[in-house]
């Protein structure tokens, strides 16, 4: 059996527009493509292909589906045959999955399944582990229902299971279930309570672990493997998708204990992200079942950032988004533990449309007691307004303008004029001095964080000439080549705040490459200007006319270089 994740990977890698254009003549219309329908006779085109959603739809005959179904219908072939063709096109080898019992995938999921069964038995024997779960509000029935297990310290359970399956220790490490400590192999999750993480087909492909004491990290997920990708996996999605169409929405949370709290409170469509925020790959999964979501992340700055990042991508895919905040508690799990049954349902009923959250987030991240702070706050919101306008969220813009006007005590028409202006320095507040919303440092940091393919080029630039000390410190730290998320996690608060303000205050460039080129050019000019300043100092200190003439000549050459640029 071919796992759902692999099928989704094939659809992600294959360009649906490219495939369909081999059969019909597609014409671009906005963000979609249009053609005469290949499935029925018509004179006016009503067949549309949406590359962002990776689907096609005909408004005439109702034909619709993904790239696999299109190939099936056009060629009259089976699902398996269509998948084989597209897999070849995507460069994905399906031979690993053809016989589940003997394939590597089959071996992998059987290993996780058998190891999990042993972990469940260990939990039954551990009073400490059961007491911890009960302290978190889980009954005996909950513990069994959610599949909790426990891995004793210095455990070698997975090694014993692997030996019985003729799986080598090297494979065990590669599968992410064990690791080597010194000269011995141990279970990766030793000393932790674990919960199974399943793929879309309901097979266990990873574990989530929680330390019983104060050990760090407190939470630990399995590492990425060939069959487990954090950005492609949502905790509890395999169950939530079955009822999502009936319920009508998903609840997106930040951790598995939060998702389980929602389940205990009778919300069957709660899922948890396994990364910092909701990924685009996960959003595509959700869109197949419902385009209505309620975001409910932690009630702190990190949770707000995750909400903003998730919201940005959800709007790109034209979702209907509400935001719920577990105030005054830190997360949904704590709210449920403190307030009890019905508390999470009540919170969801009080959730508000995303534009109100944007206003609140801006108030949290920007100091609105100064003109500069108000500028940053409004620039942050302006970027969102531009996105909302492009996606047709016009009523939401109206709500946002009204909310900001009330908050800042500035007339709505002035707020709206600022949001619609081309230049961010037309501030609807009094300022004695104008300033740029961002400089080269912020611009380069924005590109570095959002465009992975540009990072190498950015690090090759003359970054020492950046005037912003935060920008210099940022690039000094990220240039070490370590995992970006881990590096940022260790940043001091001031630098983290600077990064967030940078991300949120700069609108996405239409052409990132050109934007980088412009910023690079500014750095070159800045380097020349520094050299000119150095020469001016040398001229003042020159001991004779000959030396002064030489220095002046050098200065003139540099000024010409600037002029030519």
Curated annotation (Swiss-Prot):
InterPro entries xrefs: DNA_primase_core_N_sf (IPR037068), DNA_primase_DnaG (IPR006295), DNA_primase_Znf_CHC2 (IPR036977), DnaG_bac (IPR030846), DNAG_N (IPR013264), DnaG_primase (IPR050219), TOPRIM_DnaG_bac (IPR034151), TOPRIM_dom (IPR006171)
Gene Ontology molecular function: DNA binding; DNA-directed RNA polymerase activity; zinc ion binding
Biological process according to GO: DNA replication, synthesis of primer
Top-level taxon in the UniProt lineage: Bacteria
Binding-site residues, Mg(2+) 1: 254, 298
Binding positions for Mg(2+) 2 per the UniProt entry: 298, 300
Domain Toprim: 248-329
Cofactor(s) essential for the protein: Zn(2+); Mg(2+)
Catalytic activity field: ssDNA + n NTP = ssDNA/pppN(pN)n-1 hybrid + (n-1) diphosphate
Keywords: DNA replication, DNA-binding, DNA-directed RNA polymerase, Magnesium, Metal-binding, Nucleotidyltransferase, Primosome, Transcription, Transferase, Zinc, Zinc-finger
A single cellular component GO annotation: DNA-directed RNA polymerase complex
Assigned EC number: 2.7.7.101
Keyword Nucleus: no
Pfam family, one: Zn_ribbon_DnaG
Zinc finger (CHC2-type): 37-61
Domains (record comment): Contains an N-terminal zinc-binding domain, a central core domain that contains the primase activity, and a C-terminal DnaB-binding domain.
Family: Belongs to the DnaG primase family.
Subunit record text: Monomer. Interacts with DnaB.
Summary of the function given for this chain in its UniProt record: RNA polymerase that catalyzes the synthesis of short RNA molecules used as primers for DNA polymerase during DNA replication.
Protein name: DNA primase
Organism: Thermotoga maritima (strain ATCC 43589 / DSM 3109 / JCM 10099 / NBRC 100826 / MSB8)
Record lineage: Bacteria, Thermotogati, Thermotogota, Thermotogae, Thermotogales
């Amino acid at each position: 059996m071919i796992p759902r994740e692999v099928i989704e990977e094939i659809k992600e890698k294959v360009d649906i527009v490219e495939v369909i254009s081999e059969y019909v003549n597609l014409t671009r219309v906005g963000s979609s493509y249009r053609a005469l329908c290949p499935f029925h006779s018509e004179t006016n085109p009503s067949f549309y292909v949406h590359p962002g959603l990776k689907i096609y739809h005909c408004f005439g005959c109702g034909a619709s589906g993904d790239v696999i179904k299109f190939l099936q219908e056009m060629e009259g072939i089976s699902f398996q045959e269509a998948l084989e063709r597209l897999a070849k096109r995507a460069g994905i080898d399906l031979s690993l999955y053809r016989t589940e019992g003997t394939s590597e995938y089959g071996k992998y999921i059987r290993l996780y399944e058998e190891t999990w069964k042993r972990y469940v038995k260990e939990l039954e024997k551990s009073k400490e582990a059961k007491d911890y779960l009960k302290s978190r509000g889980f009954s005996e029935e909950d513990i069994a229902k959610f599949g909790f297990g426990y891995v004793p310290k210095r455990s070698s359970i997975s090694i014993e299971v692997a030996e019985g399956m003729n799986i080598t220790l090297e494979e065990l490490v590669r599968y992410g279930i064990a690791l080597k400590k010194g000269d011995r192999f141990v279970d990766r999750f030793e000393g932790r309570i674990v919960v199974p993480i399943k793929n879309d087909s309901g097979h266990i492909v990873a574990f989530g672990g929680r330390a019983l004491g104060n050990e760090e990290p407190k939470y630990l997920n399995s590492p990425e493997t060939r069959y487990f990708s954090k950005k492609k996996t949502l905790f509890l999605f395999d169950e939530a998708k079955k009822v999502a169409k009936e319920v009508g929405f998903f609840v997106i949370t930040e951790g598995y204990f939060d998702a389980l709290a929602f389940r205990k409170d009778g919300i069957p469509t709660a899922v948890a992200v396994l990364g910092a925020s909701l990924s685009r790959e996960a959003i595509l999964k959700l869109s197949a079942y419902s385009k209505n979501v309620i975001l409910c992340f932690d009630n702190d700055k990190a949770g707000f950032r995750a909400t903003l990042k998730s919201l940005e991508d959800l709007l790109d895919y034209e979702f209907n988004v509400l935001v719920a905040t577990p105030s005054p508690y830190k997360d949904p799990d704590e709210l449920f533990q403190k307030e009890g049954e019905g508390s999470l349902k009540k919170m969801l009923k009080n959730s508000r449309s995303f534009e109100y959250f944007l206003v609140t987030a801006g108030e949290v991240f920007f100091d609105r007691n100064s003109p500069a702070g108000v500028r940053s706050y409004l620039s942050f919101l302006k970027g969102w307004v531009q996105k909302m306008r492009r996606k047709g969220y016009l009523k939401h813009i109206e709500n946002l303008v009204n909310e900001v006007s009330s908050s800042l005590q500035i007339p709505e028409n002035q707020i709206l004029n600022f949001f619609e202006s081309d230049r961010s320095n037309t501030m609807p507040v009094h300022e004695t001095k104008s300033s740029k919303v961002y400089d080269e440092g912020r611009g380069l940091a924005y590109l570095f964080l959002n465009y992975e393919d540009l990072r190498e080029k950015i690090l090759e630039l003359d970054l020492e000439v950046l005037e912003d000390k935060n920008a210099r410190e940022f690039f000094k730290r990220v240039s070490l080549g370590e995992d970006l998320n881990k590096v940022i996690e260790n940043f001091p608060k001031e630098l983290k705040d600077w990064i967030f303000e940078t991300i949120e205050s700069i609108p996405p460039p239409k052409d990132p490459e050109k934007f980088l080129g412009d910023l690079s050019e500014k750095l070159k000019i800045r380097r020349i200007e520094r050299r000119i300043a150095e020469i001016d100092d040398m001229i003042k200190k020159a001991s004779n006319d000959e030396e002064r003439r030489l220095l002046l000549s050098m200065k003139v050459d540099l000024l010409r270089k600037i002029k030519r640029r």
